[in-house]
Design a protein with these regions (language model features):
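Short alpha-helical segments enriched in small residues
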Residues: 1-115
């Protein structure tokens, strides 16, 4: 998990030009975080989450804007969430949504495998 913008590039492999062009909170950054996690860790799946938990907006994105990226054997997806509540509630809902995305992908992949 990387929080600081510079670490998104150095540790997770998010391209610096992407961070400069779109800022740290964008669907493309969430996708790049997920792909970076998968690639750098040699994992089957990678999750990437970026968003604004508050208390203030960031880069023109309102509080509660969250992007959940998932990279897996079948490619990648990014889901936008619009959440409400305080910082802790937004973070908790984000974790639940990210894990639900991962679980759904694992279940779908398991259903495709031969018995």
């Amino acid at each position: 998990m990387v929080y600081a913008t510079d670490l998104k590039a150095t540790l997770a492999g998010v391209p610096v030009p992407l961070l400069h062009a779109e800022g740290p909170v964008s669907p493309d950054v969430a996708g790049a975080l997920a792909a970076g996690a998968r690639d750098r860790l040699g994992a089957t799946y990678g999750l990437g989450v970026t968003g604004v938990a508050g208390p203030d907006s960031q880069g023109g994105r309102p509080v509660g804007t969250v992007y959940v990226g998932l990279a897996g054997p079948g490619g990648g997806t990014v889901r936008q969430l619009t959440l409400s509540g305080d910082r802790d509630a937004i973070r908790a809902a984000t974790v639940e949504a990210a894990l639900a995305e991962l679980l759904a992908a694992v279940r779908a992949r398991s259903a495709e495998l031969p018995a």
